[in-house]
């Protein structure tokens, strides 16, 4: 995923939330995504762990 991609994020106890990627930072353990959400328009960071499906919080949104 890259900047300006439309994504959904997994949050505690609720449905996936739509957002837009503002920044991407790569690390050896995974990737950090700064995602703009309705409640957080300036963005909030989410981490996707490499190699752990349970550690994936940001996914690319399906195209309509």
UniProtKB/Swiss-Prot annotation:
Protein name: Protein DsrB
Lineage: Bacteria, Pseudomonadati, Pseudomonadota, Gammaproteobacteria, Enterobacterales
InterPro entries associated with the record: Dextransucrase_DSRB
Cross-referenced NCBIfam families: PRK10708.1
Family statement: Belongs to the DsrB family.
Domain of life of the organism encoding this protein: Bacteria
Organism: Salmonella typhimurium (strain LT2 / SGSC1412 / ATCC 700720)
Signal peptide: none
């Amino acid at each position: 995923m890259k900047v300006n991609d439309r994504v959904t994020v997994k949050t505690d106890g609720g449905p996936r939330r739509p957002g837009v990627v503002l920044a991407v930072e790569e690390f050896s353990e995974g990737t950090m995504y700064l995602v703009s959400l309705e409640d957080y328009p300036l963005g909030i960071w989410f981490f996707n762990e490499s190699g752990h499906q349970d550690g994936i919080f940001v996914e690319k949104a399906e195209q309509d």
